[in-house]
Amino acid sequence: MNAEVYQWAVVGAGPAGIAAVGKLIDHGIPGDKILWIDPAFKVGDLGQFWSQVSSNTRVALFVDFLNDVESFRFGEAAAQQFELLKLPLQDTCKLEHIVKPLQWVSDHLQQSTTARKESVKQMNLSGRQWTLTTEENEYKAKNVILATGALPSSLNYPGVDVLPFETAIDKEKLSQTIKKDHCYAVFGSSHSAIIILRHLVELGVEKIINFYRSPCRYAINMGDWILFDNTGLKGQTALWARENIDGKLPSSLSRYIVNEHNLARYLPECHQVIYAVGFEPRKNLVIGDYDHVRYNPHLGIIGPGLFGLGIAYPESKADPYGSVESQVGLWKFMVYLNKILPVWFKYHT
């Protein structure tokens, strides 16, 4: 057991975890008083699974994210000539272009903090301190930020062979997996579902069935805000959907509303199914008596000295017309963190 009590522990080293560590340092927390735990330190799922996926965030906002934290030292990183800095600011891009500078930031932040390549399995609050238990060690911290990410959701229809989402969303991996004469079902109509449908069409699959619950939703620039900013289709994915989903369906693609009749009729035709129906928080960490406690979606507070950030703990926010969405995206995480971190400093154990 490690005898030191850290001021802050950050669990997770994806974009939200990197932002949290950077902002703590910016606010004067000494790096050696910050415990940072992640099993890989490879920019989370973004770096390990999604780098070949097209973003729905503009390049300009990725650059804003990197420049917003002084301890990121991204001014120095600019000398590295990351490809991100050469791209048109108003365009979207492959996520690999933000992963590379984030990995650079993560690498140097690890040098100035107490970084441990482990997985937290359990946490408990006692004596006004959090104990974080990994397979190898126990650590203590006064405050903990969970930036543990989320996994693709599954619908678990019986008797179907599931093609993993992380394979389907990566066109290169998908091309090595599919058989063109097989039938593939894709569940969903979100950004990722449309990307996967496009992949399958462009790879020449002969029969594709899309099961969906709602029509395509598009992000619309309203000037100083964006309608359906978090849930709407953007960029090249939106253009493709307008032409091929709301326009003329490719000959290989059929679409059906999800209901009992359509599932019974068409699902048996499919050799494999792909679930592109969103994400859900990881559940591989047991937190004392907090298993059924919901986080506050406006403050990120889970309990005293315990906070959540990132895709597993997004801010809930209404647009000017009252439509409420979860704010998911790197720049949105940063804006939210800037707003709530002063509260976190006061809401200790």
Where are these regions (language model features)?
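Flavin (primarily FAD) cofactor-binding/catalytic cores of flavoenzymes
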Residues: 1-43, 85-349
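N-terminal FAD cofactor-binding segment of flavoenzymes
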Residues: 19, 23-80, 214
